[in-house]
Amino acid sequence: FDTYLTGELFSILRQHSILKHDLEAEEFNAEHPAFVNGVEVGFSESTPLLTSLFRVRARSLLIERDPLANAAFLSGRLLGEEVRSAIKNLPKMEKIHLVGGSSLTKLYAKALTLAEREVQQHPGDDLVRLGLTAAWQFLYS
């Protein structure tokens, strides 16, 4: 069993590191080219994570990348590494089910799709309601 602090690391880098000036706070979508590029870099074991972090800074200073593209790249880079690590030892399942908030599950779904995995997304709120309803019916029926 593995778990990852990907979201925590992204938040720390975005809010408390030298990169905070190079990263936009607004959300980007999973189809953003910089996000897709970041995921692909994350899948590659040839680019170390710390090198990628420096590239975010360098892209901002030298290429004048916009902060939204930098945030999308960094998010994709971190998610790409997480997905690569997570699926490395998993058999190819028929389908991976993602449960959670819409914007985050879309990012994971895109990364998993790029890793050639079939994905189905489920809204977390709906499943919690269904689970609580089933528990109530079990207890009080």
Predicted feature residues:
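Glycine-rich phosphate-binding loop plus the immediately following alpha-helix
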Residues: 1-42
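Short hydrophobic/aromatic-enriched beta-strand-loop microsegments
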Residues: 2-4, 115-125
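Conserved active-site and cofactor/substrate-binding residues in soluble primary-metabolism enzymes
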Residues: 4, 8, 48, 70-81, ...
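Glycine-rich phosphate-binding/hydrolytic loop that grips phosphoryl groups
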Residues: 14, 77, 81, 120-141
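Adenine-nucleotide phosphate-binding core of ATP-dependent small-molecule kinases
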Residues: 42-85
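Non-transmembrane, aqueous-exposed alpha-helical and coiled segments at domain scale
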Residues: 87-93
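Glycine-rich phosphate-binding loops at beta-strand->alpha-helix junctions
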Residues: 93-111
